[in-house]
Regions:
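N-terminal secretory signal peptides
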Residues: 1-12, 25
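Short edge beta-strand/loop segments characteristic of extracellular beta-sandwich folds
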Residues: 73-81, 195-201, 213-216
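Aromatic sugar-binding surface patches on proteins
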Residues: 109-118, 244-252
Length: 284
C-alpha cells in the first residue's frame, strides 16, 4: 500500500487518493495554447498526430516498471526547431503524487540546437504518472504523461542528508564531461548537435523519513540545486533540480557545435558549494 504524506509537517499530496482517482490511459497528450486554459486530449498513438503536433509534443522515455525508485532514468527529447523566433524555452518534469513532485525544470536556448535532457530522479512506490510540460515561445504549453509502477518497499523518496562536516572526500568528486560523438568518431563536425554527458559524484537526499506510513521531515535536504551550461563564453542552458534528484547523477544535454570553444558546466548545491568543469570543443 502506498504511504501517505504528513500534510501538517510537509504539505505533500497523497498518492493513494490520486491513484484511485486516475482512470486515464498509460499515455496521454495534451495541448494548452498560450493565454488559454483550455486543453485538448489526443489519442495515445503518436502516429495519429499531425506534423505540427509531433513537432511540439515532447517525447518522454522512462521505465513502465522499476524496482529502484531511488534512481529512475528519465529522457525527454523533441524535434522542435530551436531558432531565435521559434524555440522551446523550457521543460518541467513532475510526478504530482510524489512527496517531492517536481523533478526538475530545464531552460534552453537556440545554442542547444535541439531539446534533449536525460537524468535520474527519485520516485515513490506505487502506480503514478510523470508529466512533462514544454513551453514554446509561439504556441504555448504542450504536455505528455506516462505511467510508472514501483513495487512496495522499492520507493526512493526517503533519505536523510549527511551533516555539513561529513560531506567531503569520497562523498563528492569534481564533475567530468564526456562527448560521446568525439569518443565514437574521434572528432566533432561543425554545425552538428552533440550530446555532452556530465558525471558527478554528489549525494542528493530529500531529508524525508517514513513514520507510521507517512513522510515527515527528518533533516534539511542536500541536493544539487542549479546547473549552468556555457559555450564559448555564452549562456546555453540552465537546469534547476530539486531534492528528488538521484545520488551521483549522470546528466546528458544537447549542444549545437556551431564553433570551436570551451564548454563549461557550473553546478551549485543548496548549501552553496560550487563545482565546475570544462571541455574544449574542436573540429576534426
Amino acid at each position: 500500500m502506498a504511504r501517505q504524506s504528513d500534510h501538517r509537517a510537509c504539505g505533500f499530496s497523497r498518492r493513494g487518493f490520486f491513484g484511485l482517482a486516475s482512470t486515464a490511459a498509460g499515455l496521454f497528450i495534451r495541448e494548452a495554447w498560450a493565454g488559454s486554459r483550455k486543453g485538448r486530449l489526443i489519442g495515445s498513438d503518436p502516429a495519429l498526430l499531425s506534423p505540427f503536433e509531433r513537432e511540439h509534443f515532447p517525447s518522454l522515455s522512462l521505465p513502465p516498471r522499476t524496482r529502484n525508485g531511488a534512481k529512475v532514468p528519465i529522457v525527454v527529447e523533441m524535434s522542435h526547431p530551436m531558432t531565435p523566433d521559434h524555440q522551446v524555452t523550457s521543460l518541467e518534469v513532475v510526478n504530482e503524487t510524489d512527496p517531492i513532485p517536481g523533478k526538475g525544470r530545464f531552460h534552453f536556448t537556440p545554442g542547444n540546437g535541439a531539446i534533449y535532457v536525460a537524468f535520474q530522479a527519485r520516485m515513490d512506490e506505487g502506480d503514478s504518472e510523470v508529466t512533462v510540460t514544454a513551453d514554446c515561445n509561439r504556441h504555448g504549453r504542450w504536455q505528455i504523461r506516462r505511467r510508472i509502477s514501483i513495487p512496495e518497499g522499492a520507493g526512493g523518496c526517503a533519505g536523510e542528508a549527511p551533516a555539513w562536516g561529513r560531506v567531503a572526500g569520497d562523498d563528492i568528486h569534481s564533475p567530468e564531461i564526456r562527448i560521446p560523438e568525439q569518443v565514437q568518431r574521434g572528432g566533432i563536425r561543425r554545425g552538428e548537435v552533440i550530446h555532452p554527458q556530465l558525471k558527478i559524484r554528489h549525494p542528493n537526499r530529500t531529508g524525508l523519513a517514513e513514520h507510521d506510513g507517512s513522510f515527515v521531515r527528518a533533516s534539511e535536504p542536500l541536493y544539487l540545486e542549479k546547473m549552468e551550461v556555457r559555450f564559448g563564453g555564452e549562456a546555453v542552458s540552465k537546469f534547476e533540480f530539486t531534492p528528488a534528484l538521484s545520488d551521483d547523477p549522470f546528466i546528458t544535454f544537447a549542444l549545437l557545435a556551431s564553433r570551436e570553444g570551451s564548454l563549461e558546466v557550473r553546478l551549485v548545491n543548496n548549501r552553496g558549494q560550487r563545482f565546475e568543469t570544462a571541455h574544449e570543443i574542436s573540429f576534426s
